[in-house]
């Protein structure tokens, strides 16, 4: 091979790499996203090499200055990517050698691409994971603010996608607030797996130098050092745990979007999205489509698929490093970007939508949403056994359906024909929509008192998250 064509690993080879080897082996088309972490890790590694006497102070200065120059070149799009250099790590090292010659070739002392790459990925997960955490907190804050303004809005609560019971809209919003708190904690847990130094493990057996891994740990701001070089370079548990967290979050995101799609439809109509967050049809002029919600619902499948991709890839690998692991980054990068834009889209929709109380009331009445309250009235006030009460109310609902009426407009004689207790103010209070919500007085329930209590707890939860970003 000529000097220009020679790989950084090419000393053992006499033949030029085939075109298919270069095309299938290149990863710079996607792993260029690790350039910041690679330069961060390389600067720390260079400082450690100076610490143990491999580099002089002048050499370290040249390496640091040149690496920062390369970072600027990458950010300004001035560094051309070449498939023969395979990945971002080789591009940076090759450019470093161009800039400072033989000194640049010293940087890879006591380091393999195996430990270099896994360390870069860990740093990437820590950085982007913290940004995702901030986005989750921002979304939770939007839900909290919307819930505060929605306490007096009564909407249907659904089971089996059928009208079940009246709830305050704040209860619905806070249900997702708490789900996202679990996602937040899952991400915090998942990030701990990446908060570890793998650099210094070499190819897999360690290196023939008395490297200072504690120094590296402190330079990179990490909490611990991997105790076993084989495990450190080959494990992808940190990516798996991160993708598990992404998957759980996107399942919640998809379900929120499903609700938005349904609740904004003509059939439900209990909320409206503004024109700026919806699209029209190329043929049907009346259409107003919730595309953001539909796209996020679709994107959730991608993230679930990314997790499955990595699980299947890892299950049959022998110890330690295998080239298959190059494919882990595609799943990781796509999941990060998908989660970030999905959180932003959901937050915009939540802050934008308006409730339609009159449609909510109509659904509640036509869905006999206070039938359970009426049965409880018979049990508590009239001492009717619950099963008997259940049967009486069921009969009353059947009469309403047959007459195409609701519990609110069925004539009193027809009600009395079912039960003598279905009369007067007591009956009206028993089927009242607003009173129904306020009867749910158990902790965590939808009564106004419990909602105000829950909002205080939610605010306290948000305040506690401030420590995440100090």
Swiss-Prot record:
Q: Which InterPro entries match?
A: Arg_succ_lyase_C, Argininosuccinate_lyase, Fumarase/histidase_N, Fumarate_lyase_CS, Fumarate_lyase_fam, Fumarate_lyase_N, L-Aspartase-like
Q: In which pathway does it act?
A: Amino-acid biosynthesis; L-arginine biosynthesis; L-arginine from L-ornithine and carbamoyl phosphate: step 3/3
Q: What's the catalysed reaction? A: 2-(N(omega)-L-arginino)succinate = fumarate + L-arginine
One GO MF term on file is:
argininosuccinate lyase activity
CDD domains per the UniProt record, alphabetical: Argininosuccinate_lyase
In short, the EC number is: 4.3.2.1
Q: Which of UniProt's keywords are assigned here?
A: Amino-acid biosynthesis, Arginine biosynthesis, Cytoplasm, Lyase
A single GO BP annotation from the record? arginine biosynthetic process via ornithine
Main location, first listed in the record = cytoplasm
Q: Which Pfam families match?
A: ASL_C2, Lyase_1
Protein name as it appears in the record: Argininosuccinate lyase
Q: Which gene encodes it?
A: argH
């Amino acid at each position: 091979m000529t000097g220009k064509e020679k790989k950084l690993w090419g000393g053992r080879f006499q033949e030029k790499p085939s075109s298919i080897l270069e095309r299938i082996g290149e990863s710079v088309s996607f792993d260029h996203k690790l350039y910041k972490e690679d330069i961060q890790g390389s600067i720390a590694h260079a400082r450690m090499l100076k610490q143990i006497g491999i580099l002089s102070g002048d050499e370290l200065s040249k390496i640091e200055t040149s690496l920062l120059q390369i970072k600027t070149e990458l950010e300004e799009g001035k560094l051309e990517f070449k498939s023969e250099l395979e990945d971002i790590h080789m591009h940076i090292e090759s450019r470093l050698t161009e800039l400072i010659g033989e000194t640049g070739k010293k940087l890879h002392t006591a380091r393999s691409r195996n430990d270099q790459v896994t360390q870069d990925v860990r740093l990437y997960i820590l950085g982007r994971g913290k940004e995702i955490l901030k986005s989750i907190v921002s979304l939770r804050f939007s839900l909290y603010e919307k819930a505060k303004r929605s306490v007096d809005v009564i909407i249907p609560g659904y089971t089996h996608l059928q009208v079940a019971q009246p709830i305050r809209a704040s209860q619905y919003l806070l249900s997702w607030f708490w789900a996202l708190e679990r996602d937040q904690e899952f991400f915090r847990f998942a990030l701990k797996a990446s908060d570890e130094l793998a650099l210094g493990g070499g190819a897999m057996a360690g290196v023939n130098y008395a490297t200072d891994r504690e120094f590296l740990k402190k330079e990179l701001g990490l909490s611990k050092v991997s105790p076993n070089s084989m495990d450190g370079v080959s494990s992808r548990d940190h990516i798996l745990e991160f993708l598990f967290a992404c998957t759980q979050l996107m399942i919640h995101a998809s379900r929120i979007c499903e609700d938005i799609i349904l609740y904004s439809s003509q059939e439900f109509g209990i909320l409206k999205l503004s024109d700026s967050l919806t699209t029209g049809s190329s043929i049907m002029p009346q259409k107003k489509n919730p595309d953001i919600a539909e796209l996020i619902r679709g994107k959730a499948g991608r993230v679930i698929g990314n997790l499955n991709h990595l699980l299947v890839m890892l299950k049959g690998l022998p110890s330690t490093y295998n080239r298959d692991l190059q494919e882990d980054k595609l799943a990781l990068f796509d999941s990060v970007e998908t989660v970030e834009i999905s959180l932003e889209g959901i937050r915009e929709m939540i802050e934008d939508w308006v409730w339609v109380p009159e449609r909510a009331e109509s659904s509640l009445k036509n869905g006999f949403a206070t039938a359970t309250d009426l049965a409880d009235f018979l049990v508590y006030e009239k001492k009717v056994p619950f099963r008997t009460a259940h049967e009486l109310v069921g009969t009353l609902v059947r009469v309403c359906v047959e007459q195409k009426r609701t519990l609110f407009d069925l004539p009193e004689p027809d009600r009395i024909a079912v039960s003598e207790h279905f009369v007067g103010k007591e009956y009206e209070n028993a089927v009242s929509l607003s009173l129904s919500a306020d009867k749910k007085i158990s902790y965590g329930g939808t009564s106004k008192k419990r909602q105000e209590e829950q909002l205080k707890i939610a605010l306290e939860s948000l305040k506690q998250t401030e420590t995440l970003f100090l």
